[in-house]
Amino acid sequence: MKSISYLNTKEKNKKKLSIPSKTIFAKENEYGLKKPNWLKIKLPLNNKKINKIKLIMRKNNLHTVCEEAACPNLAECFNRGTATFMILGSICTRRCPFCNVSSGRPSLVDTKEPENLSKAAIKMKLKHIVITSVDRDDLKDGGSEHFSNCIRFIRKKNPDIKIEILVPDFRGCTELALNNISTYPPDIFNHNLESIPRLYSKVRPGANYKRSLELLEKFNLINPNIPTKSGLMLGLGETKEEIIEVMKDLRKSYVSMITIGQYLRPTKNHLTVNRYVHPKEFRELNLIAFDLGFKHAMCGPLVRSSYHAENQINCY
């Protein structure tokens, strides 16, 4: 039965990668609250750049979190020639109920991926690259050495490129993971808290709020000159006071960059949206972030952790 389940997961993932860009956006109003006007996205009439980036990905056997997570900003980012690469395969060892990435038994690590990633960065003429990954609890180091290898290959071929990594929590191997990544450190180290402590068991089963904060703080202690970053999604039942407390916790852990966006339900099988946060509330949180000492803050309904990431490094 396990082998059949694995094949179904792989087949599902294969089909998902071939979905045309114009159909990847979840019609959330079919499943819950009516989607407000400020969340409606205009799709581009010309998909030439989108298709070009997809072709580069397929030729180099690469994945983007933009496609895997059904990001609402895919069309905009692809048309700007940017993408967030997802390494270590497209199958996650965890099953967070908010996330659209496939879960199951992952494949072997592709040792050619760092080189292929470097080639894609050159082909796309990237000045800023964001690299993330699925959770790989099956690997002794959580995939951290692979992150390090990707950074090394990219810098070798693209010495001027800015590299941002969005990492998992490296459960059970934090020290090893941070040592591996610090060998070839990025320009920005990002790990998303995603939600408030009270909702963690619901939103991030298998994760731990304190552990995630410690990961960010420990990286900063090892690499004090490299900015750390984190992100939150709203609309799952949190209060404004709880959001601000999380922001304060991040500052206590030396995090200097933050992104806050609206949670959008990928399918009817995922967590239900509790409410749609008005843009005015996001603007208020943006001001609060700067008052708390964040050097960069981006808060808005469609903001995601890598949204306009190329502009964030300018604050340093």
Swiss-Prot record:
Record localization: Cytoplasm
Cofactor note: Binds 2 [4Fe-4S] clusters per subunit. One cluster is coordinated with 3 cysteines and an exchangeable S-adenosyl-L-methionine.
EC class: transferase
Keyword annotations of the record: 4Fe-4S, Cytoplasm, Iron, Iron-sulfur, Metal-binding, S-adenosyl-L-methionine, Transferase
Binding residues for [4Fe-4S] cluster 1: 66, 71, 77, 306
GO CC term (a single one): cytoplasm
Record field: catalytic activity: [[Fe-S] cluster scaffold protein carrying a second [4Fe-4S](2+) cluster] + N(6)-octanoyl-L-lysyl-[protein] + 2 oxidized [2Fe-2S]-[ferredoxin] + 2 S-adenosyl-L-methionine + 4 H(+) = [[Fe-S] cluster scaffold protein] + N(6)-[(R)-dihydrolipoyl]-L-lysyl-[protein] + 4 Fe(3+) + 2 hydrogen sulfide + 2 5'-deoxyadenosine + 2 L-methionine + 2 reduced [2Fe-2S]-[ferredoxin]
Family membership: Belongs to the radical SAM superfamily. Lipoyl synthase family.
Name listed for the protein in its UniProt record: Lipoyl synthase
